[in-house]
A protein has these predicted regions:
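Class I SAM-dependent methyltransferase SAM/SAH-binding core
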Residues: 55-100
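A short glycine-rich, Lys/Arg-flanked "PGG" loop and its adjoining helix->strand segment in the class I
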Residues: 128-140
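A short SAM/SAH-binding and catalytic strip from SAM-dependent methyltransferases
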Residues: 109-125
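A short acidic, Gly/Pro-enriched loop at the edge of an enzyme's catalytic core
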Residues: 102-110
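Conserved class I S-adenosyl-L-methionine
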Residues: 1-52
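SAM-dependent methyltransferase
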Residues: 145-219
Length: 254
Protein backbone atom coordinates (compact mmCIF):
# COMPACT_ATOMS: atom_id res chain seq x y z
CA UNK A 1 0.00 0.00 0.00
CA UNK A 2 1.40 3.41 -0.98
CA UNK A 3 1.59 6.30 1.46
CA UNK A 4 -1.12 8.08 -0.53
CA UNK A 5 -3.43 5.05 -0.37
CA UNK A 6 -2.71 4.63 3.34
CA UNK A 7 -3.80 8.16 4.23
CA UNK A 8 -6.63 8.27 1.69
CA UNK A 9 -8.15 5.17 3.28
CA UNK A 10 -7.55 6.34 6.85
CA UNK A 11 -8.81 9.91 6.34
CA UNK A 12 -12.41 9.31 7.53
CA UNK A 13 -11.22 7.56 10.71
CA UNK A 14 -7.76 9.02 11.37
CA UNK A 15 -9.08 10.87 14.41
CA UNK A 16 -9.60 7.49 16.10
CA UNK A 17 -5.89 7.23 16.87
CA UNK A 18 -6.49 9.94 19.50
CA UNK A 19 -8.47 9.48 22.69
CA UNK A 20 -10.21 12.78 21.89
CA UNK A 21 -9.14 14.43 18.64
CA UNK A 22 -10.61 17.85 19.49
CA UNK A 23 -8.63 17.94 22.72
CA UNK A 24 -5.53 16.79 20.82
CA UNK A 25 -5.94 19.63 18.32
CA UNK A 26 -5.97 22.15 21.15
CA UNK A 27 -3.15 20.58 23.18
CA UNK A 28 -0.89 20.14 20.16
CA UNK A 29 -1.62 23.67 18.98
CA UNK A 30 -0.57 24.98 22.39
CA UNK A 31 2.61 22.88 22.41
CA UNK A 32 3.73 23.75 18.88
CA UNK A 33 2.87 27.43 19.39
CA UNK A 34 4.95 27.50 22.57
CA UNK A 35 7.85 25.81 20.78
CA UNK A 36 7.66 28.26 17.87
CA UNK A 37 7.52 31.28 20.19
CA UNK A 38 10.52 30.02 22.15
CA UNK A 39 12.65 30.25 19.02
CA UNK A 40 10.87 32.77 16.78
CA UNK A 41 8.67 35.05 18.90
CA UNK A 42 7.32 37.15 16.03
CA UNK A 43 6.34 34.28 13.71
CA UNK A 44 3.05 34.77 11.88
CA UNK A 45 2.94 32.43 8.88
CA UNK A 46 3.18 28.63 8.90
CA UNK A 47 3.48 26.02 6.17
CA UNK A 48 2.36 22.63 7.49
CA UNK A 49 3.84 20.45 4.77
CA UNK A 50 2.43 17.10 5.98
CA UNK A 51 -0.85 18.32 7.41
CA UNK A 52 -3.00 15.21 7.01
CA UNK A 53 -6.51 15.84 8.30
CA UNK A 54 -5.29 19.06 9.90
CA UNK A 55 -4.43 18.32 13.53
CA UNK A 56 -1.60 20.87 13.87
CA UNK A 57 -2.86 23.25 11.16
CA UNK A 58 -6.20 23.64 12.92
CA UNK A 59 -4.57 24.14 16.30
CA UNK A 60 -2.15 26.78 15.03
CA UNK A 61 -4.74 28.65 12.95
CA UNK A 62 -6.94 28.90 16.04
CA UNK A 63 -4.02 30.71 17.68
CA UNK A 64 -3.81 33.35 15.00
CA UNK A 65 -1.23 31.97 12.59
CA UNK A 66 -1.79 32.27 8.85
CA UNK A 67 -1.52 28.63 7.77
CA UNK A 68 -1.12 26.77 4.50
CA UNK A 69 -1.53 23.01 4.82
CA UNK A 70 -0.16 20.63 2.20
CA UNK A 71 -0.22 16.86 1.95
CA UNK A 72 0.00 14.04 -0.60
CA UNK A 73 -3.45 12.68 0.34
CA UNK A 74 -6.36 14.41 -1.38
CA UNK A 75 -8.86 12.69 0.90
CA UNK A 76 -7.02 13.86 3.99
CA UNK A 77 -7.02 17.38 2.57
CA UNK A 78 -10.75 17.18 1.88
CA UNK A 79 -11.31 16.20 5.50
CA UNK A 80 -9.03 19.02 6.70
CA UNK A 81 -10.96 21.58 4.64
CA UNK A 82 -14.27 20.45 6.13
CA UNK A 83 -12.83 20.54 9.65
CA UNK A 84 -11.54 24.08 9.12
CA UNK A 85 -14.91 25.25 7.81
CA UNK A 86 -16.68 23.59 10.74
CA UNK A 87 -14.44 25.53 13.14
CA UNK A 88 -14.68 28.83 11.26
CA UNK A 89 -10.95 28.84 10.47
CA UNK A 90 -9.47 30.38 7.32
CA UNK A 91 -6.85 27.84 6.22
CA UNK A 92 -5.69 27.14 2.68
CA UNK A 93 -5.04 23.51 1.77
CA UNK A 94 -3.45 22.07 -1.36
CA UNK A 95 -1.86 18.85 -2.57
CA UNK A 96 1.94 18.75 -2.62
CA UNK A 97 4.61 16.16 -1.88
CA UNK A 98 6.92 17.47 0.84
CA UNK A 99 9.87 16.74 -1.47
CA UNK A 100 8.42 19.16 -4.02
CA UNK A 101 7.63 22.20 -1.90
CA UNK A 102 9.70 24.40 -4.22
CA UNK A 103 6.71 24.32 -6.59
CA UNK A 104 4.65 26.31 -4.08
CA UNK A 105 4.56 30.08 -4.20
CA UNK A 106 5.68 32.15 -1.26
CA UNK A 107 7.88 31.70 1.80
CA UNK A 108 6.98 31.37 5.47
CA UNK A 109 8.20 32.19 8.94
CA UNK A 110 7.78 28.55 9.97
CA UNK A 111 7.63 25.21 8.16
CA UNK A 112 6.43 22.21 10.17
CA UNK A 113 6.22 18.47 9.57
CA UNK A 114 4.74 16.61 12.52
CA UNK A 115 3.29 13.20 13.40
CA UNK A 116 6.27 11.16 12.19
CA UNK A 117 5.68 12.06 8.53
CA UNK A 118 9.32 12.39 7.46
CA UNK A 119 10.17 8.71 8.14
CA UNK A 120 7.77 7.69 5.35
CA UNK A 121 10.72 8.66 3.12
CA UNK A 122 12.73 5.47 2.78
CA UNK A 123 16.09 6.67 1.46
CA UNK A 124 18.71 9.22 2.48
CA UNK A 125 18.22 10.99 -0.85
CA UNK A 126 14.48 11.40 -0.27
CA UNK A 127 15.02 12.77 3.24
CA UNK A 128 17.66 15.17 1.93
CA UNK A 129 15.33 16.33 -0.84
CA UNK A 130 12.52 16.97 1.65
CA UNK A 131 14.77 18.93 4.01
CA UNK A 132 16.08 21.07 1.15
CA UNK A 133 12.49 21.68 0.07
CA UNK A 134 11.49 22.74 3.59
CA UNK A 135 14.52 25.02 3.76
CA UNK A 136 13.55 26.63 0.45
CA UNK A 137 10.14 27.69 1.79
CA UNK A 138 11.50 29.51 4.82
CA UNK A 139 12.04 33.23 5.00
CA UNK A 140 15.56 34.24 6.07
CA UNK A 141 15.77 33.56 9.78
CA UNK A 142 12.79 31.19 9.56
CA UNK A 143 12.21 28.10 11.68
CA UNK A 144 11.64 24.45 10.80
CA UNK A 145 9.87 22.15 13.27
CA UNK A 146 9.94 18.38 12.72
CA UNK A 147 8.48 15.80 15.10
CA UNK A 148 9.20 12.08 14.81
CA UNK A 149 9.00 9.03 17.02
CA UNK A 150 11.82 8.63 19.53
CA UNK A 151 13.83 6.40 17.21
CA UNK A 152 16.95 6.40 19.36
CA UNK A 153 14.79 4.53 21.86
CA UNK A 154 12.76 2.55 19.32
CA UNK A 155 15.83 1.20 17.54
CA UNK A 156 16.87 -0.37 20.84
CA UNK A 157 13.51 -1.55 22.14
CA UNK A 158 11.92 -2.53 18.78
CA UNK A 159 8.37 -2.28 20.10
CA UNK A 160 5.89 -4.38 18.16
CA UNK A 161 2.61 -2.89 19.32
CA UNK A 162 1.04 0.17 20.89
CA UNK A 163 -1.71 0.09 23.50
CA UNK A 164 -5.12 -0.48 21.85
CA UNK A 165 -7.31 2.61 21.65
CA UNK A 166 -10.98 2.03 22.50
CA UNK A 167 -13.38 4.65 21.16
CA UNK A 168 -16.66 4.31 23.03
CA UNK A 169 -19.26 5.78 20.63
CA UNK A 170 -21.83 4.11 18.48
CA UNK A 171 -20.64 1.91 16.95
CA UNK A 172 -17.75 1.09 19.27
CA UNK A 173 -14.35 1.04 17.57
CA UNK A 174 -10.99 -0.30 18.71
CA UNK A 175 -7.73 0.77 17.06
CA UNK A 176 -4.75 -1.60 17.23
CA UNK A 177 -1.33 -0.62 15.88
CA UNK A 178 1.37 -3.16 15.08
CA UNK A 179 5.02 -2.48 14.18
CA UNK A 180 6.48 -5.16 11.92
CA UNK A 181 10.28 -4.70 11.75
CA UNK A 182 11.99 -6.08 8.65
CA UNK A 183 15.08 -7.16 10.58
CA UNK A 184 16.20 -7.12 14.23
CA UNK A 185 18.97 -4.62 13.49
CA UNK A 186 17.58 -2.66 10.52
CA UNK A 187 15.69 0.64 10.24
CA UNK A 188 12.83 -0.47 7.99
CA UNK A 189 9.41 -1.45 9.30
CA UNK A 190 5.73 -1.60 8.41
CA UNK A 191 2.98 -0.12 10.56
CA UNK A 192 -0.34 -1.95 10.49
CA UNK A 193 -3.49 -0.16 11.67
CA UNK A 194 -6.34 -2.52 12.49
CA UNK A 195 -9.69 -0.85 13.13
CA UNK A 196 -12.28 -3.12 14.72
CA UNK A 197 -15.89 -1.93 14.47
CA UNK A 198 -18.68 -3.46 16.53
CA UNK A 199 -21.68 -4.50 14.43
CA UNK A 200 -25.00 -6.10 15.33
CA UNK A 201 -23.68 -9.30 13.76
CA UNK A 202 -20.23 -9.15 15.37
CA UNK A 203 -17.01 -7.26 14.72
CA UNK A 204 -15.63 -6.13 11.36
CA UNK A 205 -11.96 -5.36 10.77
CA UNK A 206 -10.30 -2.92 8.36
CA UNK A 207 -6.55 -3.04 7.77
CA UNK A 208 -4.26 -0.20 6.64
CA UNK A 209 -0.47 -0.38 6.38
CA UNK A 210 2.43 1.92 5.53
CA UNK A 211 6.19 1.69 5.32
CA UNK A 212 8.60 3.67 7.51
CA UNK A 213 12.33 4.03 7.97
CA UNK A 214 13.53 4.80 11.49
CA UNK A 215 15.95 7.72 11.56
CA UNK A 216 17.85 8.59 14.72
CA UNK A 217 18.59 12.07 16.01
CA UNK A 218 22.22 12.18 14.91
CA UNK A 219 21.33 11.13 11.37
CA UNK A 220 18.47 13.63 11.08
CA UNK A 221 20.60 16.40 12.57
CA UNK A 222 23.37 15.71 10.06
CA UNK A 223 20.90 15.66 7.17
CA UNK A 224 19.37 18.96 8.28
CA UNK A 225 22.79 20.59 8.56
CA UNK A 226 23.69 19.36 5.08
CA UNK A 227 20.47 20.91 3.77
CA UNK A 228 21.62 24.28 5.11
CA UNK A 229 19.92 24.48 8.51
CA UNK A 230 21.78 25.94 11.48
CA UNK A 231 21.25 26.17 15.24
CA UNK A 232 19.66 22.72 15.28
CA UNK A 233 18.13 21.67 18.60
CA UNK A 234 16.24 18.66 19.92
CA UNK A 235 13.41 18.98 22.43
CA UNK A 236 12.21 16.12 24.62
CA UNK A 237 8.51 15.32 24.32
CA UNK A 238 7.88 15.79 28.03
CA UNK A 239 9.65 19.17 28.01
CA UNK A 240 7.44 20.65 25.27
CA UNK A 241 4.14 18.97 26.16
CA UNK A 242 3.98 17.07 22.87
CA UNK A 243 3.69 13.34 22.32
CA UNK A 244 6.85 13.10 20.21
CA UNK A 245 10.31 14.69 20.46
CA UNK A 246 10.87 17.63 18.13
CA UNK A 247 13.80 18.96 16.15
CA UNK A 248 13.93 22.69 15.48
CA UNK A 249 16.35 24.38 13.09
CA UNK A 250 16.86 27.81 11.58
CA UNK A 251 17.50 29.17 8.13
CA UNK A 252 20.18 31.81 8.49
CA UNK A 253 19.15 35.43 8.03
CA UNK A 254 20.29 36.84 4.71
Amino acid sequence: MSVVDFYDELAPEFHLIYEDWNIAIDHQGVAIDRLIRSRLPDAQSVLDCSCGIGTQALGLASRGYKVLGTDVSERALDRARLEAIHRGLDIAFMACDLRELETLQGTYDVVISCDNALPHLLTDDDVAQALRAMYSKLLPGGLAVITVRDYDKELVERSVTAAPRVNPGTPRKVVVRLHDWDAPDGPMYTVHFLILTERSTGWSISHHSARYRAIGRDALTAAAAKAGFTNIRWHQAEDIGFYQPAMTALRDGE
